[in-house]
Protein backbone atom coordinates (compact mmCIF):
# COMPACT_ATOMS: atom_id res chain seq x y z
CA UNK A 1 0.00 0.00 0.00
CA UNK A 2 2.95 2.37 0.53
CA UNK A 3 3.66 2.27 -3.21
CA UNK A 4 0.10 2.43 -4.58
CA UNK A 5 -1.62 4.55 -1.98
CA UNK A 6 -4.36 1.92 -1.87
CA UNK A 7 -5.56 -0.03 1.15
CA UNK A 8 -5.16 -3.80 1.34
CA UNK A 9 -8.93 -4.36 1.36
CA UNK A 10 -11.34 -2.22 -0.63
CA UNK A 11 -15.08 -2.00 -1.26
CA UNK A 12 -15.89 0.04 -4.36
CA UNK A 13 -19.29 0.96 -5.77
CA UNK A 14 -19.19 2.05 -9.38
CA UNK A 15 -21.73 2.16 -12.20
CA UNK A 16 -24.33 0.50 -10.05
CA UNK A 17 -22.21 -2.56 -9.21
CA UNK A 18 -20.14 -3.61 -6.15
CA UNK A 19 -16.43 -4.48 -6.36
CA UNK A 20 -14.38 -6.02 -3.53
CA UNK A 21 -10.58 -6.38 -3.54
CA UNK A 22 -8.75 -8.54 -1.01
CA UNK A 23 -4.94 -8.66 -0.75
CA UNK A 24 -3.00 -11.64 0.55
CA UNK A 25 -1.66 -11.51 4.08
CA UNK A 26 0.48 -8.32 4.14
CA UNK A 27 2.49 -9.62 7.09
CA UNK A 28 3.75 -12.74 5.32
CA UNK A 29 6.59 -12.53 2.81
CA UNK A 30 6.01 -15.98 1.30
CA UNK A 31 2.42 -17.10 1.82
CA UNK A 32 -0.24 -16.22 -0.76
CA UNK A 33 -3.03 -17.01 1.72
CA UNK A 34 -5.39 -14.51 3.33
CA UNK A 35 -5.39 -13.35 6.95
CA UNK A 36 -8.35 -13.08 9.31
CA UNK A 37 -8.65 -9.32 8.84
CA UNK A 38 -9.07 -9.66 5.09
CA UNK A 39 -11.51 -12.55 5.38
CA UNK A 40 -13.64 -10.66 7.89
CA UNK A 41 -13.69 -7.63 5.58
CA UNK A 42 -14.78 -9.88 2.69
CA UNK A 43 -17.57 -11.53 4.69
CA UNK A 44 -18.97 -8.21 5.92
CA UNK A 45 -18.86 -6.50 2.53
CA UNK A 46 -20.40 -9.49 0.72
CA UNK A 47 -23.27 -9.48 3.18
CA UNK A 48 -23.85 -5.77 2.63
CA UNK A 49 -23.51 -5.95 -1.16
CA UNK A 50 -25.96 -8.86 -1.42
CA UNK A 51 -28.59 -6.67 0.25
CA UNK A 52 -27.82 -3.41 -1.57
CA UNK A 53 -27.30 -4.97 -5.01
CA UNK A 54 -29.89 -7.70 -5.02
CA UNK A 55 -30.01 -9.68 -8.28
CA UNK A 56 -26.72 -8.17 -9.48
CA UNK A 57 -23.29 -9.82 -9.71
CA UNK A 58 -20.67 -9.03 -7.08
CA UNK A 59 -17.13 -8.77 -8.45
CA UNK A 60 -14.36 -10.03 -6.14
CA UNK A 61 -10.67 -9.67 -6.96
CA UNK A 62 -7.83 -11.43 -5.11
CA UNK A 63 -4.49 -13.04 -5.88
CA UNK A 64 -4.90 -16.75 -5.02
CA UNK A 65 -7.64 -19.19 -6.10
CA UNK A 66 -9.52 -21.81 -4.14
CA UNK A 67 -8.25 -25.35 -3.68
CA UNK A 68 -11.45 -26.60 -5.34
CA UNK A 69 -10.81 -25.05 -8.74
CA UNK A 70 -10.09 -27.47 -11.61
CA UNK A 71 -7.05 -25.51 -12.84
CA UNK A 72 -4.27 -24.60 -10.43
CA UNK A 73 -5.80 -26.00 -7.26
CA UNK A 74 -2.31 -26.95 -6.07
CA UNK A 75 -1.61 -23.25 -5.60
CA UNK A 76 -4.95 -22.53 -3.93
CA UNK A 77 -6.23 -21.99 -0.39
CA UNK A 78 -9.39 -22.96 1.48
CA UNK A 79 -10.34 -20.02 3.66
CA UNK A 80 -11.84 -17.60 1.13
CA UNK A 81 -13.82 -20.35 -0.60
CA UNK A 82 -15.79 -21.02 2.60
CA UNK A 83 -17.08 -17.44 2.48
CA UNK A 84 -17.65 -17.10 -1.27
CA UNK A 85 -19.70 -20.28 -1.64
CA UNK A 86 -22.62 -18.63 0.18
CA UNK A 87 -23.03 -16.16 -2.69
CA UNK A 88 -23.84 -17.57 -6.17
CA UNK A 89 -23.77 -14.01 -7.57
CA UNK A 90 -20.02 -13.70 -6.88
CA UNK A 91 -17.59 -13.63 -9.81
CA UNK A 92 -14.13 -14.21 -8.35
CA UNK A 93 -11.10 -13.15 -10.45
CA UNK A 94 -7.67 -14.52 -9.43
CA UNK A 95 -4.12 -14.96 -10.70
CA UNK A 96 -1.19 -16.61 -8.88
CA UNK A 97 -0.99 -19.77 -11.00
CA UNK A 98 0.29 -18.10 -14.20
CA UNK A 99 -1.79 -20.70 -16.09
CA UNK A 100 -3.17 -19.80 -19.51
CA UNK A 101 -6.79 -18.67 -20.00
CA UNK A 102 -6.87 -20.49 -23.32
CA UNK A 103 -7.66 -23.57 -21.26
CA UNK A 104 -11.37 -23.95 -20.46
CA UNK A 105 -10.53 -24.95 -16.90
CA UNK A 106 -9.82 -21.27 -16.28
CA UNK A 107 -13.54 -20.73 -15.64
CA UNK A 108 -15.49 -22.79 -13.13
CA UNK A 109 -18.91 -22.48 -11.52
CA UNK A 110 -20.11 -24.34 -8.50
CA UNK A 111 -21.61 -22.26 -5.69
CA UNK A 112 -20.14 -19.16 -7.37
CA UNK A 113 -18.10 -18.28 -10.48
CA UNK A 114 -14.30 -18.37 -10.51
CA UNK A 115 -12.15 -17.00 -13.34
CA UNK A 116 -8.38 -17.31 -13.78
CA UNK A 117 -7.16 -14.12 -15.48
CA UNK A 118 -3.98 -15.66 -16.92
CA UNK A 119 -0.32 -14.63 -16.81
CA UNK A 120 0.58 -10.97 -17.16
CA UNK A 121 4.38 -11.37 -17.09
CA UNK A 122 5.29 -15.01 -17.75
CA UNK A 123 3.43 -18.33 -17.98
CA UNK A 124 3.71 -21.53 -16.00
CA UNK A 125 2.67 -25.02 -17.02
CA UNK A 126 0.62 -27.39 -14.88
CA UNK A 127 2.80 -29.70 -12.79
CA UNK A 128 0.14 -32.39 -13.23
CA UNK A 129 1.92 -33.13 -16.51
CA UNK A 130 5.45 -32.08 -15.60
CA UNK A 131 6.04 -33.28 -12.03
CA UNK A 132 9.79 -32.92 -12.50
CA UNK A 133 9.32 -29.17 -13.10
CA UNK A 134 11.16 -29.43 -16.42
CA UNK A 135 8.56 -27.39 -18.29
CA UNK A 136 9.86 -24.82 -20.77
CA UNK A 137 10.30 -21.17 -19.87
CA UNK A 138 7.69 -19.03 -21.59
CA UNK A 139 10.24 -16.27 -22.07
CA UNK A 140 7.65 -13.55 -21.32
CA UNK A 141 5.95 -14.36 -24.64
CA UNK A 142 2.76 -15.74 -23.08
CA UNK A 143 0.90 -12.80 -21.55
CA UNK A 144 -2.86 -12.56 -21.26
CA UNK A 145 -5.74 -10.48 -19.91
CA UNK A 146 -9.53 -10.37 -19.80
CA UNK A 147 -11.95 -7.55 -20.60
CA UNK A 148 -15.29 -7.89 -18.86
CA UNK A 149 -18.45 -6.41 -20.39
CA UNK A 150 -21.70 -6.03 -18.46
CA UNK A 151 -24.63 -6.31 -20.85
CA UNK A 152 -27.86 -4.34 -20.42
CA UNK A 153 -29.64 -7.44 -19.06
CA UNK A 154 -26.70 -7.95 -16.61
CA UNK A 155 -25.26 -10.88 -18.57
CA UNK A 156 -21.47 -10.85 -18.15
CA UNK A 157 -19.23 -11.38 -21.18
CA UNK A 158 -15.55 -12.18 -20.49
CA UNK A 159 -13.31 -11.54 -23.49
CA UNK A 160 -9.98 -13.39 -23.44
CA UNK A 161 -6.94 -11.61 -24.87
CA UNK A 162 -3.49 -12.70 -25.99
CA UNK A 163 -1.77 -9.43 -25.13
CA UNK A 164 1.62 -10.46 -26.50
CA UNK A 165 0.24 -11.15 -29.98
CA UNK A 166 -2.52 -8.52 -29.63
CA UNK A 167 -5.44 -10.76 -30.52
CA UNK A 168 -8.49 -12.36 -28.94
CA UNK A 169 -8.37 -15.92 -27.63
CA UNK A 170 -11.20 -18.26 -28.55
CA UNK A 171 -14.82 -17.31 -27.83
CA UNK A 172 -15.80 -15.16 -24.82
CA UNK A 173 -17.16 -16.77 -21.68
CA UNK A 174 -20.78 -15.85 -20.94
CA UNK A 175 -22.16 -15.67 -17.40
CA UNK A 176 -25.92 -15.32 -17.79
CA UNK A 177 -28.42 -13.60 -15.55
CA UNK A 178 -30.14 -14.13 -13.19
CA UNK A 179 -27.08 -14.42 -10.95
CA UNK A 180 -28.56 -16.91 -8.51
CA UNK A 181 -26.75 -20.03 -9.76
CA UNK A 182 -29.63 -21.24 -11.94
CA UNK A 183 -27.84 -20.35 -15.19
CA UNK A 184 -24.43 -21.84 -14.43
CA UNK A 185 -22.90 -23.29 -17.58
CA UNK A 186 -19.34 -24.09 -16.49
CA UNK A 187 -20.16 -26.36 -13.57
CA UNK A 188 -19.35 -29.93 -12.55
CA UNK A 189 -16.44 -32.14 -13.56
CA UNK A 190 -14.69 -31.26 -16.80
CA UNK A 191 -15.79 -34.61 -18.26
CA UNK A 192 -19.48 -33.68 -17.87
CA UNK A 193 -19.49 -29.94 -18.55
CA UNK A 194 -22.00 -28.71 -21.10
CA UNK A 195 -19.31 -26.77 -22.99
CA UNK A 196 -17.28 -29.94 -23.55
CA UNK A 197 -16.01 -30.34 -27.11
CA UNK A 198 -15.19 -33.43 -29.23
CA UNK A 199 -12.38 -35.84 -28.40
CA UNK A 200 -8.94 -35.30 -29.98
CA UNK A 201 -7.87 -37.16 -33.13
CA UNK A 202 -4.40 -38.66 -33.62
CA UNK A 203 -2.74 -39.60 -36.90
CA UNK A 204 0.50 -41.07 -38.18
CA UNK A 205 2.70 -43.86 -36.84
CA UNK A 206 4.99 -43.06 -33.89
CA UNK A 207 8.66 -43.59 -34.74
CA UNK A 208 10.94 -45.52 -32.36
CA UNK A 209 14.68 -44.72 -32.31
CA UNK A 210 17.71 -45.01 -30.02
CA UNK A 211 16.74 -48.40 -28.61
CA UNK A 212 18.75 -49.52 -25.56
CA UNK A 213 18.44 -52.30 -22.98
CA UNK A 214 16.06 -50.22 -20.88
CA UNK A 215 14.28 -47.83 -23.22
CA UNK A 216 14.08 -45.88 -26.45
CA UNK A 217 13.10 -42.52 -27.91
CA UNK A 218 9.70 -41.92 -29.48
CA UNK A 219 8.68 -39.21 -31.99
CA UNK A 220 5.04 -38.64 -32.96
CA UNK A 221 2.77 -36.21 -34.80
CA UNK A 222 0.71 -33.76 -32.78
CA UNK A 223 -3.00 -34.55 -32.89
CA UNK A 224 -5.99 -32.36 -33.69
CA UNK A 225 -8.75 -31.03 -31.44
CA UNK A 226 -11.61 -28.51 -31.59
CA UNK A 227 -9.64 -26.40 -29.12
CA UNK A 228 -6.21 -27.86 -28.41
CA UNK A 229 -4.65 -31.04 -27.05
CA UNK A 230 -3.44 -30.51 -23.50
CA UNK A 231 -1.11 -33.51 -23.26
CA UNK A 232 -0.35 -36.96 -24.60
CA UNK A 233 -0.41 -40.27 -22.76
CA UNK A 234 2.56 -42.38 -23.89
CA UNK A 235 2.48 -46.07 -22.94
CA UNK A 236 4.92 -48.91 -23.58
CA UNK A 237 3.06 -52.21 -23.91
CA UNK A 238 4.65 -55.66 -23.58
CA UNK A 239 3.40 -57.38 -26.73
CA UNK A 240 3.51 -60.84 -25.15
CA UNK A 241 1.45 -60.07 -22.05
CA UNK A 242 -0.29 -56.89 -23.31
CA UNK A 243 0.62 -55.27 -19.98
CA UNK A 244 1.40 -51.56 -19.84
CA UNK A 245 4.97 -51.44 -18.55
CA UNK A 246 5.62 -47.72 -18.72
CA UNK A 247 3.48 -44.58 -18.79
CA UNK A 248 4.40 -40.94 -19.07
CA UNK A 249 2.52 -37.75 -19.88
CA UNK A 250 3.93 -35.31 -22.42
CA UNK A 251 2.82 -31.68 -22.62
CA UNK A 252 1.59 -30.69 -26.08
CA UNK A 253 3.25 -27.24 -26.09
CA UNK A 254 -0.19 -25.81 -26.98
CA UNK A 255 0.65 -22.53 -25.25
CA UNK A 256 2.99 -21.51 -28.09
CA UNK A 257 -0.15 -21.25 -30.26
CA UNK A 258 0.98 -20.50 -33.83
CA UNK A 259 4.48 -21.66 -32.93
CA UNK A 260 3.41 -25.07 -31.61
CA UNK A 261 5.72 -27.77 -33.08
CA UNK A 262 4.21 -30.32 -35.47
CA UNK A 263 5.98 -33.27 -33.81
CA UNK A 264 7.06 -34.10 -30.28
CA UNK A 265 9.71 -36.48 -28.94
CA UNK A 266 10.27 -38.02 -25.54
CA UNK A 267 12.33 -40.81 -23.95
CA UNK A 268 10.69 -44.04 -22.80
CA UNK A 269 12.44 -45.76 -19.90
CA UNK A 270 12.12 -48.50 -17.34
CA UNK A 271 11.77 -51.29 -19.90
CA UNK A 272 13.08 -54.84 -19.55
CA UNK A 273 16.03 -55.92 -21.70
CA UNK A 274 15.47 -58.34 -24.59
CA UNK A 275 11.70 -57.81 -24.59
CA UNK A 276 9.29 -56.90 -27.40
CA UNK A 277 7.17 -53.75 -26.99
CA UNK A 278 4.96 -51.35 -28.89
CA UNK A 279 4.30 -47.71 -28.05
CA UNK A 280 0.72 -46.43 -27.76
CA UNK A 281 -0.06 -42.70 -27.74
CA UNK A 282 -3.35 -40.94 -26.96
CA UNK A 283 -4.15 -37.24 -27.09
CA UNK A 284 -5.98 -35.74 -24.07
CA UNK A 285 -7.75 -32.36 -24.06
CA UNK A 286 -8.72 -30.01 -21.23
CA UNK A 287 -11.94 -31.94 -20.67
CA UNK A 288 -9.91 -35.14 -20.16
CA UNK A 289 -11.35 -36.63 -23.36
CA UNK A 290 -8.94 -39.14 -24.90
CA UNK A 291 -8.37 -39.87 -28.57
CA UNK A 292 -8.15 -43.32 -30.04
CA UNK A 293 -4.52 -44.47 -29.76
CA UNK A 294 -1.91 -44.51 -32.48
CA UNK A 295 0.68 -47.29 -32.16
CA UNK A 296 4.25 -47.79 -33.25
CA UNK A 297 5.51 -50.90 -34.96
CA UNK A 298 6.84 -53.49 -32.52
CA UNK A 299 10.47 -53.33 -31.42
CA UNK A 300 12.75 -55.27 -29.11
CA UNK A 301 14.96 -53.79 -26.42
CA UNK A 302 18.61 -54.76 -26.51
CA UNK A 303 19.74 -57.75 -24.48
CA UNK A 304 22.04 -57.23 -21.52
CA UNK A 305 25.67 -58.16 -22.08
CA UNK A 306 26.31 -61.71 -20.83
CA UNK A 307 27.57 -61.98 -17.26
CA UNK A 308 31.32 -62.54 -17.16
CA UNK A 309 32.05 -65.10 -14.42
CA UNK A 310 35.69 -64.03 -14.31
CA UNK A 311 34.80 -60.55 -13.01
CA UNK A 312 35.65 -60.18 -9.34
CA UNK A 313 33.26 -58.83 -6.75
CA UNK A 314 34.02 -55.15 -6.01
CA UNK A 315 34.70 -53.79 -2.54
CA UNK A 316 32.38 -51.15 -1.14
CA UNK A 317 34.46 -48.01 -0.59
CA UNK A 318 31.98 -45.77 1.27
CA UNK A 319 30.02 -48.02 3.61
CA UNK A 320 30.68 -51.72 4.25
CA UNK A 321 29.12 -52.81 7.52
CA UNK A 322 30.23 -56.05 9.14
CA UNK A 323 29.08 -57.40 12.49
CA UNK A 324 30.95 -59.20 15.24
CA UNK A 325 29.34 -60.77 18.27
CA UNK A 326 29.41 -57.39 20.04
CA UNK A 327 29.51 -54.53 17.53
CA UNK A 328 29.08 -53.17 14.02
CA UNK A 329 32.08 -51.92 12.05
CA UNK A 330 32.48 -50.03 8.78
CA UNK A 331 35.43 -51.66 7.03
CA UNK A 332 35.18 -49.43 3.92
CA UNK A 333 38.07 -47.15 3.00
CA UNK A 334 36.03 -43.98 3.66
CA UNK A 335 36.65 -44.24 7.39
CA UNK A 336 33.07 -43.27 8.23
CA UNK A 337 32.15 -44.53 11.68
CA UNK A 338 29.19 -46.70 12.63
CA UNK A 339 27.34 -45.39 15.68
CA UNK A 340 25.12 -47.42 17.95
CA UNK A 341 21.87 -45.63 18.76
CA UNK A 342 20.33 -46.73 22.02
CA UNK A 343 21.35 -50.32 22.53
CA UNK A 344 21.78 -50.95 18.82
CA UNK A 345 20.05 -54.17 17.86
CA UNK A 346 20.78 -57.75 18.90
CA UNK A 347 23.64 -59.32 16.94
CA UNK A 348 23.94 -63.03 16.38
CA UNK A 349 25.61 -65.64 14.23
CA UNK A 350 23.38 -66.98 11.46
CA UNK A 351 24.21 -70.64 10.92
CA UNK A 352 22.58 -70.66 7.47
CA UNK A 353 24.47 -67.66 6.12
CA UNK A 354 27.65 -68.44 8.09
CA UNK A 355 27.99 -64.80 9.14
CA UNK A 356 26.99 -62.37 11.86
CA UNK A 357 23.78 -60.37 11.39
CA UNK A 358 21.80 -57.77 13.28
CA UNK A 359 18.44 -59.02 14.46
CA UNK A 360 15.74 -56.40 14.90
CA UNK A 361 13.50 -59.51 14.78
CA UNK A 362 9.73 -59.19 15.00
CA UNK A 363 9.39 -55.82 16.74
CA UNK A 364 12.08 -53.53 15.39
CA UNK A 365 12.94 -50.29 17.18
CA UNK A 366 13.11 -46.64 16.23
CA UNK A 367 15.36 -46.02 19.25
CA UNK A 368 17.81 -48.91 18.91
CA UNK A 369 19.61 -49.23 15.58
CA UNK A 370 22.91 -48.41 13.86
CA UNK A 371 23.73 -45.31 11.85
CA UNK A 372 26.45 -43.78 9.69
CA UNK A 373 26.57 -39.97 9.94
CA UNK A 374 28.15 -38.44 6.81
CA UNK A 375 27.35 -34.77 7.48
CA UNK A 376 30.41 -32.76 6.48
CA UNK A 377 32.11 -35.81 4.93
CA UNK A 378 32.94 -34.86 1.34
CA UNK A 379 34.27 -38.35 0.61
CA UNK A 380 30.72 -39.63 0.88
CA UNK A 381 28.82 -36.72 -0.67
CA UNK A 382 31.22 -36.43 -3.61
CA UNK A 383 31.28 -40.20 -3.87
CA UNK A 384 27.56 -40.59 -4.56
CA UNK A 385 26.75 -37.39 -6.46
CA UNK A 386 27.56 -38.80 -9.92
CA UNK A 387 26.72 -42.45 -9.34
CA UNK A 388 26.46 -45.05 -6.57
CA UNK A 389 25.39 -48.53 -5.53
CA UNK A 390 23.25 -49.44 -2.51
CA UNK A 391 23.34 -53.05 -1.36
CA UNK A 392 21.59 -54.95 1.44
CA UNK A 393 21.20 -58.63 2.30
CA UNK A 394 18.20 -59.03 4.56
CA UNK A 395 15.02 -60.86 5.47
CA UNK A 396 11.80 -59.67 7.07
CA UNK A 397 9.65 -61.61 9.51
CA UNK A 398 6.67 -59.32 8.85
CA UNK A 399 5.42 -59.01 5.28
CA UNK A 400 2.67 -56.50 6.06
CA UNK A 401 4.25 -53.56 7.92
CA UNK A 402 6.07 -50.58 6.38
CA UNK A 403 9.76 -50.89 7.31
CA UNK A 404 13.24 -49.94 6.07
CA UNK A 405 16.34 -52.19 6.26
CA UNK A 406 18.89 -49.61 5.01
CA UNK A 407 17.84 -46.06 4.29
CA UNK A 408 18.53 -42.33 4.16
CA UNK A 409 15.21 -41.08 2.79
CA UNK A 410 14.30 -38.15 5.03
CA UNK A 411 12.91 -35.61 2.52
CA UNK A 412 15.45 -36.75 -0.10
CA UNK A 413 18.22 -39.32 -0.59
CA UNK A 414 17.93 -43.03 -1.26
CA UNK A 415 17.33 -46.35 0.43
CA UNK A 416 15.49 -49.65 0.62
CA UNK A 417 11.88 -49.83 1.77
CA UNK A 418 9.31 -52.51 2.41
CA UNK A 419 5.60 -51.78 1.93
CA UNK A 420 6.22 -48.02 1.73
CA UNK A 421 2.68 -46.63 1.65
CA UNK A 422 3.11 -43.04 0.46
CA UNK A 423 4.49 -43.47 -3.06
CA UNK A 424 3.35 -45.43 -6.10
CA UNK A 425 3.70 -48.25 -6.94
CA UNK A 426 2.34 -49.40 -3.59
CA UNK A 427 2.43 -52.97 -2.29
CA UNK A 428 3.90 -55.20 0.41
CA UNK A 429 7.23 -55.77 -1.28
CA UNK A 430 10.83 -54.56 -1.19
CA UNK A 431 11.49 -51.38 -3.16
CA UNK A 432 14.34 -49.04 -4.03
CA UNK A 433 13.65 -45.32 -3.66
CA UNK A 434 15.66 -42.36 -4.92
CA UNK A 435 14.79 -38.69 -4.73
CA UNK A 436 15.58 -37.13 -8.09
CA UNK A 437 14.11 -35.03 -10.90
CA UNK A 438 11.74 -33.34 -8.43
CA UNK A 439 10.07 -36.56 -7.30
CA UNK A 440 10.66 -39.95 -5.68
CA UNK A 441 11.58 -42.72 -8.08
CA UNK A 442 10.28 -45.97 -6.62
CA UNK A 443 10.92 -49.38 -8.18
CA UNK A 444 9.84 -52.75 -6.80
CA UNK A 445 12.20 -55.70 -6.63
CA UNK A 446 9.39 -58.25 -6.93
CA UNK A 447 5.63 -58.64 -6.82
CA UNK A 448 4.04 -58.65 -3.38
CA UNK A 449 2.74 -62.15 -4.07
CA UNK A 450 6.32 -63.38 -4.50
CA UNK A 451 7.61 -62.09 -1.14
CA UNK A 452 8.19 -64.73 1.52
CA UNK A 453 8.63 -64.05 5.21
CA UNK A 454 11.91 -65.09 6.84
CA UNK A 455 13.61 -65.48 3.47
CA UNK A 456 16.89 -63.70 2.74
CA UNK A 457 17.00 -61.50 -0.37
CA UNK A 458 20.06 -59.88 -1.91
CA UNK A 459 18.79 -56.42 -2.94
CA UNK A 460 20.97 -54.02 -4.90
CA UNK A 461 20.30 -50.88 -6.91
CA UNK A 462 22.60 -48.60 -8.87
CA UNK A 463 22.45 -45.09 -10.28
CA UNK A 464 24.96 -44.00 -12.91
CA UNK A 465 23.88 -40.38 -13.27
CA UNK A 466 21.17 -41.24 -15.78
CA UNK A 467 19.67 -44.66 -15.03
CA UNK A 468 18.52 -46.57 -11.95
CA UNK A 469 18.94 -50.35 -12.19
CA UNK A 470 17.62 -52.95 -9.73
CA UNK A 471 19.02 -56.42 -9.13
CA UNK A 472 17.47 -59.21 -7.08
CA UNK A 473 19.64 -62.17 -6.04
CA UNK A 474 22.26 -61.27 -8.62
CA UNK A 475 19.92 -60.70 -11.57
CA UNK A 476 18.57 -57.55 -13.22
CA UNK A 477 14.86 -56.89 -12.56
CA UNK A 478 13.96 -53.25 -13.36
CA UNK A 479 15.20 -49.80 -14.37
CA UNK A 480 14.11 -46.17 -14.64
CA UNK A 481 15.56 -42.91 -15.90
CA UNK A 482 16.81 -40.45 -13.26
CA UNK A 483 18.81 -37.44 -14.40
CA UNK A 484 19.35 -35.59 -11.13
CA UNK A 485 19.90 -36.81 -7.56
CA UNK A 486 18.63 -34.84 -4.57
CA UNK A 487 20.40 -35.56 -1.28
CA UNK A 488 19.27 -34.76 2.28
CA UNK A 489 20.58 -31.58 3.85
CA UNK A 490 21.52 -30.43 7.31
CA UNK A 491 21.27 -32.94 10.14
CA UNK A 492 19.34 -35.42 7.98
CA UNK A 493 22.62 -36.55 6.38
CA UNK A 494 22.91 -39.97 7.97
CA UNK A 495 22.18 -43.57 6.98
CA UNK A 496 20.20 -45.96 9.18
CA UNK A 497 20.78 -49.70 9.30
CA UNK A 498 17.59 -51.29 10.58
CA UNK A 499 15.34 -48.21 10.13
CA UNK A 500 14.92 -45.00 8.12
CA UNK A 501 16.58 -41.70 8.95
CA UNK A 502 14.75 -38.71 10.39
CA UNK A 503 15.43 -34.97 10.39
CA UNK A 504 18.31 -35.45 12.84
CA UNK A 505 20.20 -38.28 14.59
CA UNK A 506 18.90 -36.83 17.85
CA UNK A 507 15.36 -37.72 16.76
CA UNK A 508 13.94 -41.21 16.83
CA UNK A 509 14.37 -43.10 13.58
CA UNK A 510 11.39 -44.17 11.47
CA UNK A 511 9.84 -47.41 10.25
CA UNK A 512 12.04 -49.89 12.09
CA UNK A 513 12.96 -53.06 10.22
CA UNK A 514 11.54 -56.34 11.47
CA UNK A 515 13.90 -59.13 10.55
CA UNK A 516 17.65 -59.47 9.99
CA UNK A 517 20.30 -57.52 8.09
CA UNK A 518 23.53 -59.26 7.10
CA UNK A 519 25.05 -56.87 4.56
CA UNK A 520 24.77 -53.06 4.32
CA UNK A 521 26.96 -51.38 1.72
CA UNK A 522 27.34 -48.20 -0.32
CA UNK A 523 29.73 -47.83 -3.29
CA UNK A 524 30.86 -44.66 -5.05
CA UNK A 525 30.09 -46.13 -8.46
CA UNK A 526 27.31 -47.99 -10.24
CA UNK A 527 28.52 -51.59 -10.30
CA UNK A 528 27.82 -53.57 -13.47
CA UNK A 529 25.77 -56.73 -13.95
CA UNK A 530 28.81 -59.03 -13.82
CA UNK A 531 29.94 -57.46 -10.55
CA UNK A 532 26.44 -57.86 -9.10
CA UNK A 533 26.46 -61.54 -10.00
CA UNK A 534 29.86 -61.97 -8.31
CA UNK A 535 28.65 -60.21 -5.14
CA UNK A 536 25.69 -62.56 -4.88
CA UNK A 537 27.88 -65.57 -5.62
CA UNK A 538 30.12 -64.60 -2.68
CA UNK A 539 27.14 -64.82 -0.36
CA UNK A 540 25.84 -68.13 -1.66
CA UNK A 541 29.32 -69.64 -1.65
CA UNK A 542 29.92 -68.57 1.93
CA UNK A 543 26.71 -70.23 3.10
CA UNK A 544 28.12 -73.61 1.96
CA UNK A 545 31.37 -73.37 3.96
CA UNK A 546 30.72 -75.20 7.23
CA UNK A 547 34.13 -74.22 8.58
CA UNK A 548 32.79 -70.73 9.38
CA UNK A 549 30.67 -72.28 12.12
CA UNK A 550 33.77 -74.01 13.49
CA UNK A 551 35.58 -70.68 13.40
CA UNK A 552 32.73 -69.00 15.27
CA UNK A 553 32.91 -71.61 18.03
CA UNK A 554 36.62 -70.90 18.43
CA UNK A 555 36.10 -67.12 18.48
CA UNK A 556 33.37 -67.21 21.11
CA UNK A 557 35.00 -69.86 23.33
CA UNK A 558 37.38 -67.40 24.95
CA UNK A 559 40.26 -69.84 24.49
CA UNK A 560 42.13 -68.00 21.72
CA UNK A 561 45.07 -65.71 22.32
CA UNK A 562 44.65 -62.05 21.39
CA UNK A 563 46.76 -62.58 18.30
CA UNK A 564 44.74 -65.58 17.11
CA UNK A 565 41.42 -63.91 17.96
CA UNK A 566 42.36 -60.88 15.86
CA UNK A 567 43.34 -63.12 12.96
CA UNK A 568 40.17 -65.17 13.33
CA UNK A 569 37.83 -62.16 13.38
CA UNK A 570 39.54 -60.80 10.27
CA UNK A 571 38.66 -64.06 8.50
CA UNK A 572 35.08 -63.97 9.81
CA UNK A 573 34.55 -60.36 8.72
CA UNK A 574 35.92 -60.87 5.21
CA UNK A 575 33.04 -61.97 2.99
CA UNK A 576 35.54 -63.45 0.50
CA UNK A 577 37.34 -65.73 2.98
CA UNK A 578 37.79 -69.16 1.39
CA UNK A 579 37.45 -72.67 2.79
CA UNK A 580 41.20 -73.15 2.34
CA UNK A 581 41.98 -70.10 4.48
CA UNK A 582 39.66 -71.38 7.21
CA UNK A 583 41.17 -74.86 7.12
CA UNK A 584 44.64 -73.38 7.52
CA UNK A 585 43.57 -71.23 10.49
CA UNK A 586 41.73 -74.06 12.25
CA UNK A 587 44.75 -76.33 11.79
CA UNK A 588 46.96 -73.59 13.20
CA UNK A 589 44.75 -73.22 16.29
CA UNK A 590 44.56 -76.96 16.88
CA UNK A 591 48.34 -77.27 16.67
CA UNK A 592 48.89 -74.81 19.51
Residue ranges with predicted function:
Residues 1-43, 47, 53, 79-89, ...:
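Extended active-site neighborhood of metal-dependent phosphoesterases/phosphodiesterases
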Residues 101-201:
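Binuclear metal-dependent phosphoesterase catalytic core
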Residues 150-153, 455-469:
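Localized edge beta-strand/strand-to-loop motifs within extracellular or lumenal beta-rich domains
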Residues 302-365, 533-549:
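Extracytoplasmic low-complexity segments
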Residues 307-316, 516-557, 563-564, 571:
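Extended recognition patches within non-cytosolic domains
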Residues 314-318, 325-330, 364-431, 467-468, ...:
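Extracellular glycan-recognition modules
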Residues 433-458:
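Short, aromatic/His-centered strand-loop micro-motif at the edge of beta-sheets
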Residues 480-516:
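Flexible glycan-contacting loops in extracellular carbohydrate-active proteins
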Amino acid sequence: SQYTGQSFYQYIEKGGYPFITISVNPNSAWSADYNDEGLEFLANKLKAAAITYKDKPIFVFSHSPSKRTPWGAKWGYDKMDKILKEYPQVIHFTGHTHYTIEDERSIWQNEYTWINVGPSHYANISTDITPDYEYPDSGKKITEAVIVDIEENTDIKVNRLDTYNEKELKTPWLIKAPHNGSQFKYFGDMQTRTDKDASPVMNGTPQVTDITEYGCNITFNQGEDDSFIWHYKVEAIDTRTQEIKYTRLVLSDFYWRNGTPETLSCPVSGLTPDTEYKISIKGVDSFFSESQPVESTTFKTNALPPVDPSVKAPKADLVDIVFTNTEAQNVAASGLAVTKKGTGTPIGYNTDLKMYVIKPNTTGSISNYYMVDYKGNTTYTNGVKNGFTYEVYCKTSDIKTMQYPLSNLQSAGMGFTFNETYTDPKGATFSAMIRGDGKYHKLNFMKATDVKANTYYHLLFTWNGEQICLYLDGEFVASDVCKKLTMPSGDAQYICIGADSNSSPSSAAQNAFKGEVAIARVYSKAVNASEVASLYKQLTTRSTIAEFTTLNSLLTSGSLSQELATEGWALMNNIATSKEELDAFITKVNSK
